[in-house]
Curated annotation (Swiss-Prot):
Its EC number is 2.3.2.27. The keyword Transferase applies. The gene is rnft1. CDD domains: RING-HC_RNFT1. It is a multi-pass membrane protein. It comes from Xenopus tropicalis (Western clawed frog). E3 ubiquitin-protein ligase that acts in the endoplasmic reticulum (ER)-associated degradation (ERAD) pathway, which targets misfolded proteins that accumulate in the endoplasmic reticulum (ER) for ubiquitination and subsequent proteasome-mediated degradation. Protects cells from ER stress-induced apoptosis. GO terms for biological process: positive regulation of ERAD pathway; protein ubiquitination. Residues 349-400 are annotated as: Required for ubiquitin ligase activity and for protection against ER stress-induced cell death. It comes from the Eukaryota. Disulfide bonds: none annotated. InterPro entries: RNFT1/2, Znf_RING, Znf_RING/FYVE/PHD, Znf_RING_CS. This is E3 ubiquitin-protein ligase RNFT1. The lineage of its organism: Eukaryota, Metazoa, Chordata, Craniata, Vertebrata.
Amino acid sequence: MKHRPVHERQCSTETKNWKENTQLIMQSSSGHTHHQPGSNDSPSVCMSLPVPQLSAEGSCTAGDVTIDLSSPESHHGARSSSRRVRPGNGRSLSRHGHTHSHDANGPEDANDADSREQSNSISEVFHFYKWLEKSFPYILIFSAKLVVQHITGISVGIGLLTTFLYANKCIVNQVFLRDKCSKLQCLWILVFLLFSSLLLYYTFSSQALYYSLVFMNPSLGPLHFFDALWVVGITDFIGKFFFMGLKCIILLVPSFVMSHKSKGYWYMALEEVAQCYCMLVSTPVWFRYLIDYGNQNSGAEWHFGILLALLYLILKLLIIFGQRKTSSNSLRLFLTQPNYGAAATKSQCSEVDGMCAICQAEFIKPIVLVCQHVFCEECISLWFNKEKTCPLCRTVISNQSHKWKDGATSLQLRIF
């Protein structure tokens, strides 16, 4: 038996191994064949296999070989279609997944932003609270010093406010009682208001604060802010006391001389005049403070003060013009004093058993409203001081404002 050379035996062994690998790969790839549109029904398989290649010297080396089992046309169509379709499908899937990721992350990002903003605001409030907590002792110390410096003004302000609240409550109660009001109580309120005003001006007589009641400047030096506030506050309260005293004088007038209905219109007119007066009486004081003749060191400061004073006057005129309609309506009601109905006949009074539904007593000067309900003139006038409808059927009788007809005085301070 003739022995073959060693290199031939090696090539034969490698050839057998290559054939076995080829068969295995062909069997495994037979289930992955694809039918391409536009090609024949026969499947096409394209494989890349490692095969040995013989060199010129007769040695075998590993390489790649492609085995085509279909026709060239089908093979070319399958390859071109696979090249065209697969990248497109990948890109579309990539875009689709990217879009879904954005859609899914959008609400989460918005929620995260909202939560961050909320946490930042809470953190700012917390830091402010901590700062306030640490600064509270210092604030308390300086506040105590400020109170001690202005203890006189604070005490006078509390006293004036207490006097006003007491007198206003007493006047409203006496107006509500009508014929049963206490003349002695009204006289006491009048004396109390007069004595309080005189005592205040006597205590601070060196400042001549009463000059401001007649739109003149008090005898003070250069006005600072708290000085102007002191003068305006006292003048405002004293002006209210003056008009409250006039209301007490009207209360002392007997009802047969002036009816309660007429008194209500007088109270309303006095209150409108009081508000206008208190709004105007502070103008000279603030005008002097803004110009401040005594502390002008240069022409620029003086011109700046003049500009501020002019702006203040313009704003004051705008406020007066805005209240012009309300004041004119109140003045018209005071001059005309309209009636709510006509005098009722005896037959109309007998239909309701001759008794007023408000006071539950016999009629005194009965009047019939447009809704044909009968009441006492004084009773229905007192009712319409706060209401605009009939007390029985709620029919609108008067659309006009009847504010301040109960004798009350506004607590609003006309500081500026």
